[in-house]
Regions:
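PRPP-associated nucleotide enzymes
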Residues: 1-129, 133-192
Length: 192
């Protein structure tokens, strides 16, 4: 029952505070990925921990920047480390890197995301976490990083899945367990 209440609260926040933008963009910056409702974010993290309670998870992986708050909340709830893939190779990165190309639907931009090898060890079971799941490119890129590391992706979770954009279907067709805390079936003329 608790999980259903958290997901219902997320749906209510999306309807009340979400702003529809042209191009099927949903702006939820008031609570999810710009300004953070910390208490609510921790509740979402607890729900992720509940959903994946039967899985052995060694690490959480996300992409900067918008996935970090949710991934951090899940990290705390699961008691495992969280690492984020950087969208830019900075001068303070040392040692070997895993890297892959990712296309951002929201920004319509291609990034080469990187993770230092020391933060994504071989042989681990990794949960992918992101704020949105639209076309699935970000999560597929994260899966590629996990594969490069010689680890296993045990699942993926997004706060919000845009079901009409088929990224979730694509990932599920590859045998990946994908969970969404909220599912949007359509965004016709600003109506969710």
């Amino acid at each position: 029952i608790w999980g259903a209440l958290v997901m219902k609260a997320l749906e209510e926040k999306i309807v009340k505070e979400g702003v529809w933008l042209p191009g099927n963009i949903l702006k939820v910056g008031s609570f999810l990925n710009h300004q953070i409702d910390g208490k609510f974010m921790m509740e979402l993290g607890e729900e992720i921990a509940r959903l994946f309670a039967q899985e052995k998870i060694d690490r959480i992986l996300t992409i900067e920047t918008s996935g970090i708050p949710l991934a951090m909340a899940a990290s705390v709830a699961l008691g495992v480390p969280m690492v984020f893939a950087k969208k830019n190779r900075t001068s303070n990165l040392s040692g070997g890197l895993y890297q892959t190309a990712v296309h951002s639907y929201t920004h319509n931009t291609d990034y080469t995301v990187v993770v230092e090898k020391q933060y994504l060890p071989a042989g681990e079971r990794v949960l992918l976490v992101d704020d949105f799941l639209a076309n699935g490119k970000a999560l597929m890129g994260l899966m590629e990083l996990v594969n490069q590391a010689g680890s296993q992706t045990v699942g993926a979770v997004a706060a919000i899945e845009k079901g009409f954009q088929k990224g979730g279907d694509l990932l599920r067709s590859q045998g990946l367990r994908v969970e969404a805390l909220a599912l949007i079936d359509s965004m016709d003329n600003g109506n969710l």
